[in-house]
Swiss-Prot record:
It comes from the Eukaryota. Pfam families: AMPK1_CBM. Residues 127-151, 451-465 have a biased composition (Basic residues). The keyword S-adenosyl-L-methionine does not apply. This is Cruciform DNA-recognizing protein 1.
């Protein structure tokens, strides 16, 4: 046991300044303990004071608004020249130990939180008497309100009231005033506890309360019972960031498409559509025979045109088998062409005949697959007659145009006659002109151009004469 003595003491300073700080030997004169301002306006603080022995003293001082001061309410001593401090002895500390059992706040420098509560005991007799009086008043009110029909209920109530009277309380107040329900607190011996030693409750760290304590205090560290079995605690991997990035980037790269191989694939896909050399050529022999038969006929029809014989192509080879069916049509076409020449010799020139023959022969006897088209029909006698009568029709049209022009001129003349002024209007105009001449002889020079303007009607008369 150490021989140090500890007491709780309250330091105070009267109201007036803004800030008051307590300093002394307890903090090596650093001014670290500010006083708390109370509702009254003064400053107070309660803190534990330690003394090494009975003869030791506790030296302190106040810093009021930044100025070091000494209080007159405490004892003073001169330490050196010009330096004065307040001090406390053991006798001063013992006198203030009436509140030694009060609970204190260590974080606030030992400030008192309140006086110790009164030890629990049986309820006072005065409260019990008050409860009985109130119960009697309630009973009298219930009896006045009851009627004859409720006698049975009143009897049961009286029985219950008698039972309550034996115990001294009613059923309503049993829970609040019964001695059995109020637990007796264990008596605490305050004198045994040393002043300044705070009472700390024991902590129950059983297995049942460990989980709840973690939740109350917040999420704490998790202690696993079998850390050796978990792979994450034992396995450690060393990964190079550069190698990992290179490997991932290589996988992400996609080769760009090349234009060459794609074109070759499209050509190879289309190539089967062309005729192959392995196929049997059965129709070509017949086609060649038919072409030889057609060539002399073409020469007989078109002797003026000397064209080279067309070579057989795959398209011609496919379409030539149908030419055998068209041969009789070609003979009829030749006869019709001769008739057309005889009917149109007087109208068309010789040069146009040759050109038309060449065009028609080419259209009819070409080896293209358009041979199946319907042939052009020859012109009839009526159509040729209409072609010959075309000059007469044009003369009739010209006559009609001349007649229409003459009718338009007649209409214009009629409208001009309607616009001619009457004899009365002419007289009025002459009278007005004479008046103007008599009124202003100097205006003769100005009237000459006006006469020219009125000569328009004279011109119209000359035209109709």
């Amino acid at each position: 046991m150490s021989s140090e003595l500890m007491f709780n003491y309250t330091f105070s300073w009267p109201a007036g300044p803004k800030d008051v700080i307590l300093t002394g030997t307890f903090d090596d004169w650093r001014g670290t303990l500010p006083l708390v301002k109370t509702a009254k306006g003064n400053f107070e603080i309660t803190m534990p004071v330690k003394l090494a022995n009975k003869d030791d003293t506790f030296q302190f001082k106040f810093i009021v608004d930044g100025v070091w001061c000494v209080s007159d309410s405490y004892k003073k001593e001169h330490v050196s020249e010009g330096i004065e401090n307040n001090f406390l002895q053991i006798t001063d500390l013992v006198e203030t130990q009436e509140v030694a059992g009060a609970s204190r706040i260590p974080e606030a420098g030992g400030l008192l939180c309140g006086k110790p509560p009164r030890s629990a005991g049986p309820p006072s007799t005065s409260n019990r008497k008050k409860n009985k009086r109130n119960n009697k008043k309630r009973r009298s009110k219930l009896k006045k309100k009851s009627t004859k029909n409720n006698k049975k209920s009143n009897e049961s109530l009286d029985d219950n009231e008698e039972e309550d009277g034996v115990t001294g309380t009613t059923t309503e107040d049993v829970t609040g005033t019964s001695r059995e329900e109020t637990p007796l607190a264990e008596p605490t011996n305050v004198s045994k506890e040393a002043p300044g030693n705070f009472h700390i409750l024991p902590i129950d760290q059983s297995a049942d309360t460990t989980x709840s304590n973690g939740i109350i205090g917040g999420p704490g560290p998790v202690l696993v019972p079998n850390p050796g079995e978990i792979k994450e605690f034992t396995e450690i991997r060393d990964v190079d960031a550069r190698e990992l990035n290179e490997r991932l980037n290589k996988k992400e790269e996609v080769p760009e498409p090349v234009a060459g191989p794609i074109v070759e694939s499209s050509v190879t896909e289309k190539s089967p559509a062309l005729p192959q050399a392995d196929d049997p050529i059965v129709e070509t022999k017949e086609v060649a025979h038919n072409v030889q038969e057609l060539t002399p006929q073409v020469e007989a029809v078109t002797p003026l045109i000397n064209e080279p014989e067309p070579l057989p192509t795959p398209e011609a080879q496919i379409s030539i088998p149908e030419s055998s069916k068209v041969e009789p049509v070609e003979g009829s076409l030749q006869s019709k062409l001769v008739e057309k020449r005889e009917s149109t010799e007087g109208v068309l020139d010789g040069s146009k005949k040759v050109e038309n023959k060449a065009k028609k022969d080419e259209e009819v006897f070409t080896l293209d697959p358009i041979v199946n088209k319907a042939p052009k029909l020859p012109l009839t006698d009526e159509q040729t007659a209409e072609g010959r009568k075309s000059p007469a029709v044009s003369e009739e049209k010209e006559k009609k145009k001349k007649q229409e022009k003459g009718s338009k001129e007649v209409k214009r003349s009629e409208t001009s006659k309607e616009k001619k002024p009457s004899a009365k209007e002419v007289k009025k105009q002459t009278v007005k002109a004479s008046k103007k001449q008599t009124a202003s002889p100097l205006s003769s020079s100005t009237e000459e151009p006006k006469k020219k303007k009125t000569g328009f009607f004279g011109k119209l008369k000359k035209l109709f004469k």
